[in-house]
Swiss-Prot record:
Record's keyword annotation contains Oxidoreductase: yes
Short name of one Pfam family: GMC_oxred_N
UniProt subcellular location: Peroxisome matrix
Subunit: Homooctamer. Assembles only after import into the peroxisomal matrix, fails to assemble in the cytoplasm.
Induction cue: Induced by methanol. Subject to strong carbon catabolite repression.
GO terms assigned for molecular function: alcohol oxidase activity; flavin adenine dinucleotide binding
Recorded domain comment: The C-terminal peroxisomal targeting signal (PTS) is essential for the efficient targeting and import of AOX into peroxisomes via the PTS1 pathway.
Stated role: Major isoform of alcohol oxidase, which catalyzes the oxidation of methanol to formaldehyde and hydrogen peroxide, the first step in the methanol utilization pathway of methylotrophic yeasts.
Name listed for the protein in its UniProt record: Alcohol oxidase 1
Residues forming the catalytic site: H567
Organism: Komagataella phaffii (strain GS115 / ATCC 20864)
GO CC field: peroxisomal matrix
Annotated SUPFAM superfamilies: FAD-linked reductases, C-terminal domain, FAD/NAD(P)-binding domain
């Protein structure tokens, strides 16, 4: 199908939100020509995308489906530069993310303080997106006919129930539906963006774009094409200038112009959307001139208010009789063949899950809060106290070591994955040149507000005690835990001799061989627990007592290991143009997602969020996509059933079902 040079609607960026926007609008009216421009490659039936269990491959530094942005050095990270990966493939984060189904809290969207963005306004759109593929006690808040599927996947590692029982012993109750928009403290068997019927990842592009293109001819897909700038004519966004995703000839840059008759929607993501606006002349005039760009519209908020969820991992050894995904990820050929064959036979087995089987959302008890520093206590009173639906931290259990398996000994592991739900820290991103290939001036602001440290330290301690109450537990991976003083009772401990021998087998001559006191083995459990029915342990390791030096070791570990959770947002915030308490540098968009100072231009991605959301952000990205598509439809004069914009169901072709299209 030939690509025209003019469209009715142009959607710039085919990520989680952009794919939704383009697919919906192409089904608003099949006489509308909709163009979707994406910098990455097409994800159609790419096994690195649709096979859930191999998602870690997309995070590798040589990934073809992600780009990596390096920040300025930060004293808050002990001088490190943060590395923030962003999807570089059609479908965006939905093609490569962890597939964790997590909703924000009701107060999150109310806190946007924008007309039409309250949770009561957005709930119908949340339901419209999803097909909830499990028994449901809350049918009023979930959807059952949407294009995106939600399930437990088609496999569950045994670490799931062990974690849930251990969490309960920590005062974290099991909850049937932790994504009910109101519960902020509990544990659950975690749902996933996986289609139960096929065992495939449920990404935005297959659900909205490919399904539409197989049934209608009014949606045009332009991949491997980077948005350079938006062209404004007589106060209206009229066209977009693009370049190849990678420079073909730096001395002779290649440009192409696409025009839009009715609407342009910018959806390049939290990092790239503000850069496109800045190259187009929207932003802080001083910064624009310094970068060699003529200011067009004075919007200092463009590129400010950068937010993320701060993440760190804590891996543990597990006993050899338990199952993990380590041998599969490590490259055991026999195991990989068995796992792949099972998935291609019936869509089940370890490839049909992400291995993140259970997790918690938590708020501190009054006693726990009193033990945190005064700065966080004050922040808690201001931000959390009157919003009981907001969790402070999340952590979940991963059924294996999440990281580079060439850097650790063979064996079986589990990993605690933590992230701070509502950081107080803020960052920024700005262009340094009109060149679309130039690296930006990027300060994500990780940990630059002292109030963010206390809950991170608390979560490490909390998750560590959860791990120590699990029957899987066989010691810490000491190289990936804080460097506590040698004499500290909190010191991380390796596997005990019995477990080492079980791994080594009768012919192993070195299991348990220690070099002096370099490492210390785990001691046998000694503490009795009367609550063993729910905790899964009759005998427990005693609670660790941490002193001030131990806390400093944890803080140092967090500064050296905190990273992005791939949940960045906020750089093109909705809010008053003159600014507000939550958008201090001034809003970029009005409540209908229109860019101030120009007609015909909206932004529709996570960058529009003025404040954070307590969830894995694919849920919010889809919601923003649905909301933006509805706003565009209304602006074009459509109403009623037309705004349903129902997309066709994506169906596999015969060749695709056979599994012959493998790697």
């Amino acid at each position: 199908m030939a690509i025209p040079e003019e469209f009715d609607i142009l959607v710039l960026g085919g990520g989680s939100s952009g794919s939704c926007i383009a697919g919906r609008l192409a089904n608003l009216d099949h006489s509308l020509k909709v163009g979707l421009i994406e910098a990455g490659e097409n994800n159609l039936n790419n096994p690195w995308v649709y096979l859930p269990g191999i998602y870690p491959r997309n995070m590798k530094l040589d990934s073809k489906t992600a780009s990596f942005y390096t920040s300025n050095p930060s004293p808050h990270l002990n001088g490190r530069r943060a590395i923030v990966p962003c999807a570089n493939v059609l479908g965006g984060g939905s093609s490569i993310n962890f597939m964790m189904y997590t909703r924000g809290s009701a107060s999150d969207y109310d806190d946007f303080q924008a007309e039409g963005w309250k949770t009561k306004d957005l709930l119908p759109l949340m339901k419209k997106t999803e097909t909830y593929q499990r028994a449901c006690n809350n049918p009023d808040i979930h959807g059952f006919e949407g294009p995106i599927k939600v399930s437990f996947g088609n496999y569950t590692y045994p670490v799931c129930q062990d974690f849930l029982r251990a969490s309960e012993s920590q005062g974290i109750p099991y909850v049937d539906d932790l994504e009910d928009l109101v519960t902020a403290h509990g544990a659950e068997h975690w749902l996933k963006w996986i289609n139960r019927d096929t065992g495939r990842r449920s990404d935005s592009a297959h659900a909205f774009v490919h399904s539409t293109m197989r049934n209608h001819d009014n949606l045009y897909l332009i991949c491997n094409t980077k948005v350079d700038k938006i062209i404004v004519e007589d106060g209206r966004a009229a066209a977009v200038r693009t370049v190849p995703s990678k420079p073909l000839n730096p001395k002779k840059p290649s440009h192409k112009i696409y025009r839009a008759r009715k609407q342009i929607v910018l959806s390049c993501g939290t990092i790239s959307s503000p850069l496109v606006l800045q190259r187009s002349g929207f932003g802080d005039p001083i910064k624009l001139r310094a970068a060699g760009v003529k200011p067009l519209v004075n919007l200092p908020g463009v590129g400010r208010n950068f937010q993320d969820h701060y993440c760190f991992f804590s891996p543990y050894r597990i006993k050899p009789q338990y199952e993990s995904f380590d041998d599969f990820v490590r490259g055991d050929a026999e195991i990989q063949k068995r796992v792949f064959d099972q998935w291609y036979a019936n869509g089940t087995g370890p490839l049909a899950t992400n291995g993140i089987e259970a997790g918690v959302k938590i708020r501190p008890t009054p006693e726990e809060l009193s033990q945190m520093d005064e700065s966080f206590q004050e922040g808690y009173r201001e931000y959390f106290e009157d919003k009981p639906d907001k969790p402070v931290m999340h952590y979940s259990i991963i059924a294996g070591f999440f990281g580079d398996h060439t850097k650790i000994p063979p064996g079986k592991y589990m990993t605690m994955f933590h992230f701070l739900e509502y950081p107080f820290s803020r960052g920024s991103i700005h262009i340094t040149s009109p060149d679309p290939y130039a690296a930006p001036d990027f300060d994500p602001g990780f940990m630059n507000d002292e109030r963010d440290m206390a809950p991170m330290v608390w979560a490490y301690k909390k998750s560590r005690e959860t791990a120590r109450r699990m029957d899987h537990f066989a010691g810490e991976v000491t190289s990936h835990h804080p460097l506590f003083p040698y004499s500290s009772e909190a010191r991380a401990l390796e596997m005990d001799l019995e477990t080492s021998n079980a791994y080594g087998g009768p012919l192993n001559l070195s299991a348990g061989l220690a070099h002096g006191s370099w490492t210390q083995p785990l001691k046998k459990p000694t503490a009795k627990n009367e609550g063993h029915v729910t905790s899964n342990q009759v005998e427990l390791h005693p609670d660790i007592e941490y002193d001030e030096e131990d806390d400093k070791a944890i803080e140092n570990y967090i500064r050296e290991h905190t990273e992005t959770t791939w949940h960045c947002l906020g750089t093109c915030s909705i809010g008053p143009r003159e600014g507000s308490k939550i958008v201090k540098w001034g809003g970029v968009l009005d409540h209908r997602s229109n860019v101030y100072g120009v007609k015909g231009l909206k932004v529709g991605d996570l960058s529009v969020c003025p404040d954070n959301v307590g969830c894995n952000t694919y849920t919010t990205a889809l919601l923003i996509g649905e909301k933006t598509a509805t706003l565009v439809g209304e602006d074009l004069g459509y109403s009623g059933e037309a705004l349903d914009m129902t997309v066709p169901q994506f169906k596999l072709g015969t060749y695709e079902k056979t599994g012959l299209a493998r790697f």
